[in-house]
Amino acid sequence: MEPRAPPRLSVSSPRRESGATVPSHSPSTLLSCASSETATEKRRRWTGVLSVFGGVLVHVCLGTVYTWGTLAVYVVSYMRLLQIQSLQAASDASTLLERTSEEDGSSLSVFAFASAPSLVRLSDSAWVLASQFAGMTLGMPLGGIAQKTLGPCRTVILGGALMSLAVGMAPVLLHSYALFVTVFGVIQGVGLGLAYTAPLLCGLAWFPEKKGIVSGAITAGFGTGALLFSPLQAAFLNPLSIAPSQAPYASHPAELYYDVSDSDQLEILLRVPRLFRLLAVCYLLLVSAGAALLRVPAASPGVRTPGASACVFDEEAALVKSLEREEVRDETREEARATVSVRTALVSWTFWSLWTLFFLNGLAICFTASFWRLLAVDRNTRAYILTETQLALVGAAASACNAVGRLAWGHLADKRGFQTSLMGLSALWSLLLFFLPNAAPKGGLCYALAVSGSFFCLGGNFSVFPSAVASVFGPDAIGHLYGFIFGSQLASSLGFAYLTQRVAQTIGTDGLSTLMGLCTALTAMSVFCLPALSPTPRKRHSFQKQS
């Protein structure tokens, strides 16, 4: 028998574990395989990039939840107008009306009603943001379930439609604060939750090795939403930048509302219902555009057809490198599929440690998003230190920092671990919250920097915590487990709303800011001290053994 020629060096397909061999190919076949590989890789990458961009568009719409900090004074003032009109129509206290009319004119009767204890106040506006986060907490697990049957595109459109419906119904509910909170708050929040996780899952499925960057980029859209919409809303409602001037409560001189007895301020309030209708249409169009770009990679993108699954090489080292990169991606995907079950995670100390830390930072999130404008009031002059236009610019800058913070802290989580990122974020935020009550008296620039820095830290939470869940429990856990972690925001939003009713009336917004600074400081110290959050590499393997 003639001796066989030595076999040519070949690279096997992913099926090589079963012993399958791959025949050699001619140089022309090799070049065709390489070019086909390159073209396919480019198409896949662009599809992934477009899917991430679609997720950004969706989150831009969802992020308009943070425009409530700008809208609150207008909406609450309009509610007070409706309530005052109702009180005037139903009041039998004619002697009060006659006395006030004789002393100071008819406008004083309006002021008498403006200080009525039954009227909604700015401190009550915290319940709106709290109810929105509560609805998001309920909607996120439903979104994870819905996308398994409906797919990401239809799930996002369903959530966006529910959100737009809630915003569109708001004008007919402004007469009742309870109904407004239920629909504009809870139901809109459920729509937000339904549409929130699907873009993240799509992005992480395309780029599982870049958890922090992908989650940061998509959720940066959440911060950009307020950046884009807050100035537009302020320009539509208040093009002349007229500041509120009515201070009906002597014990809280910084609590200012728009005066319905002033014709210019009344004209501002009458634009509120039309704004909600316009926003409803814009939200639905924006969500639909983003959802149309969402795509999910194939179930096993590393498996190729037999004819193109392997190539033989002689001197073509470039093709070898391409296949090696594909093997690395295959290993990453196999690791991504090894996800901890919900049952195992819910009984772990790590889960409840993350839940508690998100709760503590969630209190500061609610405070920063709801009360940043109130800290711009000079307590001595009872006036804002900035004009309405300047406040809108501060809000836009803060929203930009919100978006940038998600990218920056997410990138740090990728490079140094989520523990380092979360500890640095919370420590910096604590310092800013301690300083924020004293920022306005030092000047508008100082106030703007403090607010922007606070939003820079606020945004980081929404990229660091998803990155933490993916790092500890597996990337696929974002869909079914992050919703439970986000449940801490239900507790923190309700807890903050309770604090504003019980504590804020005593310690004021300055004391509340200091209290929130203590919460974020506790988060920073807990990350450093809790053994459940120690930065052990491969921590997830211990969970997998338990499951």
UniProtKB/Swiss-Prot annotation:
Pfam families: MFS_1. It comes from the Eukaryota. The chain crosses the membrane at residues 46-66, 126-146, 167-187, 189-209, 212-232, 278-298, 345-365, 385-405, 417-437, 445-465, 467-487, 515-535. SUPFAM superfamilies: MFS general substrate transporter. InterPro entries: MFS, MFS_Riboflavin_Transporter, MFS_trans_sf. This is Apicoplast pyruvate carrier 1. One of its GO terms (molecular function) is transmembrane transporter activity. One of its GO terms (cellular component) is apicoplast membrane. Interacts with apicoplast pyruvate carrier 2. It is found in: Plastid, Apicoplast; Membrane. The keyword Plastid applies. Residues 21-33 have a biased composition (Polar residues). The lineage of its organism: Eukaryota, Sar, Alveolata, Apicomplexa, Conoidasida.
